[in-house]
A protein has these predicted regions:
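Acidic helix-start/capping segments at beta-turn-to-alpha-helix junctions
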Residues: 67-68, 72, 79-85, 97-121, ...
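Catalytic Zn2+-binding segment of zinc metalloproteases
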Residues: 169-184, 202, 207-208, 392-406, ...
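C-terminal motif of bacterial Sec signal peptides marking the signal peptidase cleavage site
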Residues: 25-28
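Short helix/loop segments within enzyme catalytic domains
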Residues: 81, 93-95, 191-193, 197-235, ...
Length: 490
């Protein structure tokens, strides 16, 4: 994030007053620290929230699929099952939505980049670590079983393998659909990637509806893991969406996956340059200073003054007495505490533990994330911290207007209002003392996916169970503004 700007008052955040206050008994005693209990709330794109271990079904048959170089390793077994399954999916979807038969992918290849070098699609496998790809000239899908798939399984579980290969099959589908998906030789990479991510989401919905012979996917942790896996493989902050090879920011990638999960494969094929240009958030750094700092502001008391001012400006139209951000140990002397950031009702203050927040706010080590060798000093970035602080600040705003502050809907409304604040801070005419930098929205999503995150938690620190709903709430606030927060999360 960047500091600066002029004082201003913009009606960017409109909280509807007069909401009925839900009377819930608080169990926290004086000074009690409340842990992040999970809450199941609502649905996931029309499906019930389910809780079970996702992955291969116990009774799944051995797939009748062969791939060059495949071994009996669990990663290859998962890959072959994934390919059999996503092929079944497209055998069904292509005739139904596009009026044609799905021609199966011609070649499949498994390789270990640390093993014997092989040439595939004009490149040595030694140079293709951490990769899975579709090669149009050879109609081939290949995957790195030695580094990438083990890393994905370790971090996100078996469904991450299915998600990554489904994405590559999405590119094969594009090649077959051609003009039916608006794809030709001049189509930009980012449009192709957004479509492929969307196709992945539509396939995951099919599994979640229990239509797969091979896999089962819960709509809580299972969907969370799929989103986390695709979020991991995102472009670096400051990348431009129009660059050749751009895959999109984490914010943009998760949006496309959720779009497919919600609206299906036919909608994915409608994604075009006009749509992508209107909503894509991946932009380069605005100046040399921002690039040199990689968009990171120090987590200091001085920076928190800017956070306070920006939040006050954004929510001034509510007429609510703004909570004050106070340095300390991040706890309240009385009532609920959710360190390292707590909203203290008795004095309308947000207490922060700056030492802990400084560690969280260290720049992310994206290369380390991808290689599984994350630096011990790496954090999530400055906006991960600022969004956490904002999540407790808006407890005071919601309380001030009489909105419920406990329960799952309150947690989602919180994430939505943080997104609305980010929208305010991204508006150069808002007068905000803080402005978004490239990568800030990804830092917020990274924070949302943390097990300790308060970003989609109610006043007690109880967070919503499914990451799909958490990310969707943040995105709704950012794209639509605050009115959608109170209209959607009542």
């Amino acid at each position: 994030m960047r500091t600066g700007g002029r004082p201003g008052r913009v009606n960017a955040v409109r909280v509807i007053a007069g909401l009925a206050v839900v009377a819930l008994t608080a169990t926290a005693c004086a000074g009690e620290q409340v842990t992040g209990e999970l809450q199941t709330v609502g649905e996931v794109a029309g499906l019930p929230v389910t809780h079970f271990e996702s992955g291969l079904k116990d009774d799944a048959a051995k797939p009748d699929v062969r791939a060059e170089g495949a071994t009996d390793a669990v990663e290859d077994r998962l890959a072959l099952a994934s390919i059999a399954d996503v092929t079944d999916y497209w055998d069904e979807q292509m005739p139904e939505h596009f009026g044609e038969k799905f021609e199966h992918v011609d070649k499949l290849m498994s390789y270990d980049p640390e093993g014997e070098a092989q040439e595939v699609c004009g490149t040595s496998t030694r140079d293709m670590a951490l990769n899975a790809f579709y090669c149009p000239p050879e109609d081939l899908v290949a995957w790195d079983r030695g580094v990438l798939l083990p890393l994905l399984r370790e971090k996100f579980g078996d469904m991450a393998v299915a998600a990554v290969l489904a994405h590559e099959f999405g590119h094969a589908v594009q090649t077959r659909l051609g003009e039916k998906a608006g794809i030709d030789g001049g189509t930009s990479t980012i449009v192709k990637e957004q479509q492929a991510d969307c196709f992945t989401g539509s396939y995951m919905r099919w599994i979640a509806e229990d239509k797969s012979k091979y896999f089962e996917l819960s709509t809580s942790d299972g969907v969370n893991e799929v989103l986390g896996a695709l979020f991991l493989i995102r472009d670096a902050p400051g990348s431009h969406a129009n660059e050749q090879g751009a895959h999109g920011s984490g914010f943009d990638r998760t949006y496309a996956v959720q779009l497919g999960f919600e609206e299906g494969a036919k909608r994915c094929a409608e994604i075009d340059k006009t749509e992508v240009d209107e909503r894509i958030t991946e932009v380069p750094f605005k100046n040399a200073t921002d690039q040199a700092q990689q968009g990171q502001a120090p987590i200091t008391g001085g920076t928190m003054v800017h956070v306070q001012r920006s939040l006050d400006q954004a929510f001034s139209a509510t007429g609510v007495d703004p909570p004050q951000i106070v340095e300390g140990d991040g706890t309240c002397q009385q009532g609920r505490s959710t360190p390292p950031v707590s909203y203290c009702e008795q004095n309308n203050e947000v207490h922060i533990d700056l030492t802990t927040l400084e560690k969280i706010g260290q720049p992310a080590d994206q290369v380390g994330e991808l290689t599984g060798k994350n630096s011990p000093d790496a954090g999530l970035g400055d906006f991960a911290v600022f969004s956490e602080v904002a999540s407790r600040y808006v407890q005071g705003i919601q309380k001030g207007v009489g909105a419920p502050t406990e329960g799952g809907q309150a947690g989602l409304r919180t994430a939505c209002l943080v997104g609305a604040w980010a929208k305010f801070a991204n508006n150069p005419d808002s007068g905000s003392t803080l402005y978004l930098s490239p990568g800030d929205l990804d830092e917020a999503i990274a924070e949302l996916l943390q097990p300790r995150s308060l970003l989609a938690a109610d006043i007690n620190g109880h967070r919503v169970a499914n990451g799909f709903a958490r990310i969707e709430a943040l995105r709704n606030g950012y794209l639509e503004g605050s009115s959608v927060c109170t209209e959607t999360y009542k």
